[in-house]
Design a protein with these regions (language model features):
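Extreme N-terminal tail/first-helix region
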Residues: 1-20
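Acidic/His metal-coordination segments adjacent to aromatic residues that form catalytic metal sites
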Residues: 2-5, 86-102, 132-141
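Hydrophobic alpha-helical core bundles mediating ligand binding, dimerization, or RNAP-core interactions
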Residues: 14, 18-21, 25, 55-58, ...
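Long, hydrophobic N-terminal alpha-helical segment
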Residues: 14-16, 20-46
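Short, contiguous alpha-helical
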Residues: 34-85, 114, 122-167
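Acidic/histidine-rich alpha-helical segments that form the ligand environment
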Residues: 82-125
Length: 167
């Protein structure tokens, strides 16, 4: 396992990632979060809801692991299996929700993730690498934000720069 992070280091790393995420949202500003066309027709609010939906799945998965349950229920209908259909479901489930609710939900689900991971012992947390099939990857805070960094952050930052130039 080598240089695996301790639980404290992992949770601190995740909190730092969340702080950077919140700073980006603050920079964007709530007034701009419902404007479409940030990425594929989605607004910042839609991206927040999307990331929250998938993070909620992670929380449920970790809660099941904590209880030594083999299976868990995703937050979407179980017949949905493909990412695109899950993403469409998340979008439809959240598109008419108020921005304040979506942002609050995002923060609440992050806190649930922290609380759930904190409930694992150090040894159980280190075993998550094997459980999740991450033999070559260290469980870290950035791992929980990888999808955001790879798939959404570039679009959000490019859109933000465009908005800044128009101000």
């Amino acid at each position: 396992m080598g240089t695996s992070l301790s639980k404290t280091q992992l949770l601190d790393s995740m909190r730092n990632e969340q702080a950077a995420w919140e700073a980006l949202l603050d920079e964007i500003g709530e007034a701009h979060m419902t404007q479409p066309e940030v990425a594929g027709g989605w607004s910042i609010k839609d991206i927040v809801a999307h990331l929250t939906g998938w993070r909620r799945r992670s929380v449920r998965r970790f809660q099941a692991l904590l209880k030594h349950e083999a299976d868990f229920s995703p937050p979407w209908p179980p017949e949905l299996q493909e990412d695109d259909e899950i993403n469409a479901w998340i979008y439809e489930a959240n598109r008419d929700r108020p921005l304040a609710e979506v942002l609050s939900d995002s923060r609440e689900v992050f806190q649930q993730l922290i609380k759930t991971l904190d409930a694992f012992s150090e040894d159980e947390l280190q075993d998550l690498r094997r459980t999740l099939g991450l033999e070559e990857e260290q469980v870290s805070g950035s791992m929980f934000f990888a999808h955001f960094h790879q798939e959404h952050e570039p679009d959000m930052r490019a859109w933000l720069e465009k908005v800044k130039q128009e101000r």
